[in-house]
From Swiss-Prot:
The modification Phosphotyrosine is found at Y76, Y117, Y219, Y265, Y304, Y525. Residues 498-515 have a biased composition (Low complexity). One of its GO terms (biological process) is negative regulation of T-helper 2 cell cytokine production. The record marks Y304 as: Essential for its interaction with RUNX1 and its ability to inhibit RUNX1 transcriptional activity and suppress TH17 lineage development. Changing Y219F: Significant loss of ABL1-mediated phosphorylation and loss of transcriptional activator activity. This is T-box transcription factor TBX21. Lineage-defining transcription factor which initiates Th1 lineage development from naive Th precursor cells both by activating Th1 genetic programs and by repressing the opposing Th2 and Th17 genetic programs. Activates transcription of a set of genes important for Th1 cell function, including those encoding IFN-gamma and the chemokine receptor CXCR3. The modification Phosphoserine is found at S52, S224, S508. Phosphorylations at Ser-52, Tyr-76, Ser-224 and Ser-508 are regulated by mTORC1. Phosphorylation at Tyr-525 is essential for its interaction GATA3. Phosphorylation at Tyr-219, Tyr-265 and Tyr-304 enhances its transcriptional activator activity. Phosphorylation at Thr-302 is required for its interaction with NFATC2. Ubiquitinated at Lys-313, leading to its degradation by the proteasome. Ubiquitination is essential for controlling protein stability, binding to the T-box-binding element of the IFN-gamma promoter, and for interaction with NFATC2 through induction of phosphorylation at Thr-302. Deubiquitinated by USP10 leading to its stabilization. GO terms for molecular function: DNA binding; DNA-binding transcription activator activity, RNA polymerase II-specific; DNA-binding transcription repressor activity, RNA polymerase II-specific; RNA polymerase II cis-regulatory region sequence-specific DNA binding. Changing Y117A: No loss in its ability to induce IFN-gamma. The gene is Tbx21.
Amino acid sequence: MGIVEPGCGDMLTGTEPMPSDEGRGPGADQQHRFFYPEPGAQDPTDRRAGSSLGTPYSGGALVPAAPGRFLGSFAYPPRAQVAGFPGPGEFFPPPAGAEGYPPVDGYPAPDPRAGLYPGPREDYALPAGLEVSGKLRVALSNHLLWSKFNQHQTEMIITKQGRRMFPFLSFTVAGLEPTSHYRMFVDVVLVDQHHWRYQSGKWVQCGKAEGSMPGNRLYVHPDSPNTGAHWMRQEVSFGKLKLTNNKGASNNVTQMIVLQSLHKYQPRLHIVEVNDGEPEAACSASNTHVFTFQETQFIAVTAYQNAEITQLKIDNNPFAKGFRENFESMYASVDTSVPSPPGPNCQLLGGDPFSPLLSNQYPVPSRFYPDLPGQPKDMISQPYWLGTPREHSYEAEFRAVSMKPTLLPSAPGPTVPYYRGQDVLAPGAGWPVAPQYPPKMSPAGWFRPMRTLPMDPGLGSSEEQGSSPSLWPEVTSLQPEPSDSGLGEGDTKRRRISPYPSSGDSSSPAGAPSPFDKETEGQFYNYFPN
């Protein structure tokens, strides 16, 4: 016991030679597949039981080899797993002075001084808009908005009365003690000792910065001091902070910070823990945390220099509503004076008598002539107008849209043809004054043409009756005049009403019946429907 057999090296150091296959058959290693130690005997194959260790140990569980997975020549004897030592598949820590494990698959070798599992590194990059100081973590709430302005070099307006910042400073704080009291304030410091000027579309340095300007450079949050739970409950906003260039400002000194124009500044957030009984003015470096965000740098100006910054302010600042309204009102007045474009069912020209002169630019089916008996009507696609009877002949459409008829006076001019192919400018057509009516009116129409009724002979002379316009509808003549003998020329020829016997004299005889007798009135009443 304790003597290592010759030809067998230490397995831990990797010096054990591979067993030779000479003189060994396939069944020679069957006795080595499983190892059964004798009671009270130690495992001779475990090199850790050698005399070099000097300490005995008790045997553990056996780990047999997987049957049938390897050939006999490649089967290694099993090794007992001892409590307190790594089992199969586990690794020993690297020995002292070793270089650790070699790099594998492109991964560098770990630092041996850091052990097998090195701890986290503290120099990792923080995400944008987040700063850490000790246990406190502060995030810039409107980081994305500040980044947009920072791409074009943020500008802040300063005035005598003071102007609020936009974007304003807003932070989210974490890591404070809920019951401790903290004081928060913002100060503004110079970024460099240069004077800036906007030239050729960019900001360039020109000369040295002016001397320190007297005035307030500190703005304390109105809620200070307060508990940590109060500060962490919601965002800490400095929206009431104002910037001014008035050196002798005496009003609202605590709400304004005095700056110089054309200088670059950097705002900073200070969080100071206030102890009980300690004055607010007293602060030490041990309980003060300062947070700086590079994207909040700005150049103080009295008027915006970069047009990109001006547009960003108008688009994102809710207080710039007046700028947007003035800009939009310049075009709103023009839009209101111009009528909206007509719809597809609206005719652009209102003068129907001159429609044939435009080569039928806006044709409308069944406009001047009645529709075919079997043709369906599209009540939506046809336009509707309310005009004189000589301009329209589709009374059914008015009834469909529930419009009341109204008689409008007809303007003098050429009449509209009611037949297909009729040309107003035909030679000899002239400009007739009397309207033309279709041979047969629609029985369902709401309008009935009016014709002239004879007047009382005692009310006026025949010349006045002949010159008076037609006001009464045409009815079947009692006795037609001799001039109306040509009835075969057309049904559309007008016929004059004469209740008296035909004669060459237009004056009525003394014994002629009155047109207002009962017999005469009955024939007029038969014309009108009940």
